[in-house]
Amino acid sequence: MTQSILQSARRIVVKVGSSLVTNEGHGLDRCALGGWAGQISRLRQMGKEVVLVSSGAVAEGMQRLGWKMRPAALYELQAAAAVGQMGLAQAYADCFSEYELQTAQILLTHDDLSSRKRYLNARSTILTLLNLGIIPVINENDTVVSDEIRFGDNDNLAALVANLIEAEVLVILTDQEGLFTGDPRKNTDARLIPEVSVSDPDIEVMAGGAGSSIGRGGMQSKVMAARRAARSGAHTVIASGRAKDVLVRLAGGEAIGTILLADMPVKVARKLWLADHLQVRGSVVLDDGASRALLSGGKSLLPIGVVEIKGEFERGEAISCLDASGREIARGLINYDARESRKIMRRPTSQIEAVLGYVDEYELIHRDNLVIL
């Protein structure tokens, strides 16, 4: 399975973490960057389109600023990112030029993808760059994001980019060999899992743990990224970036690391955008009947099926739909703000006008603006 997937893939997103592009967090490792450029150039020769999601800006900024410890304050991280992003972009441009390839720097925030228009613009830009034979180098725009609107880590960002451009494979390179049955640093009996389905409930337990002090993403974030990428049909490979020529060998069909197979229904474009690219502003708790109607009946969400409103939100913003146990089962764009929603919840649609004095929509969330997770 691994061999056919990697060999047949024509569009790949490659994510390299901080530990693979820096000298243990002390500035960029130019030799490592040159190695990635060389491998990606060989993938291009194989006829594959490659988008690179690279960490390293904050680590490079810390080095240039003389900071030994990763700062906790957001404004200090943003300052380090601003300083380091210049060096990261130039270093990649220099490395890829050795192989007569041009690079393009793309910095994204969650807001860029939460707007349908900007989402499509970002997609068009990246696809145009690929058509021109240019290597897009993508990172989160750490200089301007706040905690509330950040992607979380570059594993998540890479998965969203895979969704955005409909890549067939997401390759997440890390300092670990792949997904194990347990933490190999603590359990000597832990075994590498060569292949697993993203829907396997056991993989979250196996992932456990956190990342290094250099970056933000641990194995658990990589598993969640794989599940997100699977929504657009992309398979994910988690492998060691320390393995010699790992990208070339993967593209040649060699089984390295763990492949997480996408076995989930592929979301259509608008539903995918609703599921992954909107910042959730609140949530509604549904009764059992409403949950069943959404999950099996393909129905819109009506006020009568809502038992609780959580958070504050405006009309048209994205909210989560939770079942009685608190599990998120759907996500959508709500037709009424939080104050209005609280007034009409548990009521039939025939009473909306009497309660509010007007009717904008008879549904709390129309099924066209609703995606099941």
Swiss-Prot record:
It is found in: Cytoplasm. Gene3D superfamilies: Acetylglutamate kinase-like, PUA domain. One of its GO terms (biological process) is L-proline biosynthetic process. CDD domains: AAK_G5K_ProB (cd04242), PUA_G5K (cd21157). Residues 281-359 form the PUA domain. The keyword Nucleotide-binding applies. Signal peptide: none annotated. Keywords: Amino-acid biosynthesis, ATP-binding, Cytoplasm, Kinase, Nucleotide-binding, Proline biosynthesis, Transferase. This is Glutamate 5-kinase. It comes from Nitrosomonas europaea (strain ATCC 19718 / CIP 103999 / KCTC 2705 / NBRC 14298). The gene is proB.
